[in-house]
Amino acid sequence: EVSSVSIDAYHSSVITHKNCKISKLKKNGADLTFDYLAYALPYPLDSISRSGWGNKRSQRDAMQLVPFMEEFNQERFQVTNLEKGMYRLTIDNQFIDNLSSEKLANGVNLADYPNTPQYQQAAKIMYLNEERFEVEKRFREYLWTEYSFLKKEGLLFADDQKAIDKLKEYLPKDGFLRMSYDWYIKAMNPEIREVWSNYMKSLVETIYKINKPVTHKVRLVRVE
């Protein structure tokens, strides 16, 4: 669970809150505002098919098979005792959705909304980590090539023309090597590996700079 909050609009009070902090709760007529600081971020489900190893499906497609959202990715937001009508939900002045008082009374899962600021923050972290993974994979393919083919030839970390020539002998017979060969040709150069390592370090540092939840201004405004 990411967080859970339940607010009584009529009494302008927080009924329950879990793994979050609610402050500056104010009611102005039928409208409601408060500051919301969750102690965790929602898990951003990638809706883009990455096609790795022939895979054509996205993470979000998997939600049809497992109850991940219901059991793990819950950012519950409930407001009871609102005047009957439709309400515009904004977070940090960003429009999220128009919701009925009935739906708000039942509660909604904010983790289902990819347009919330907290979801967008989590998505940035996801993309940075995916980039880190892609660079790290180059090292794995380089080492796989070294230990799967060159070690038995007495050419472990030789990284020279003799090693290249030996790999070329294996290329017609091994499809995995054909997929990794271009990365080996690049990674055999220590200068390139150093650049990749520094890039990964920079990515990780950026992730840790932006991965802390921040306080958001939540507003419910009656629209009809």
Residues covered by each model-derived region:
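Conserved catalytic region of serine esterases and O-acyltransferases that act on ester linkages
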Residues: E1-E224
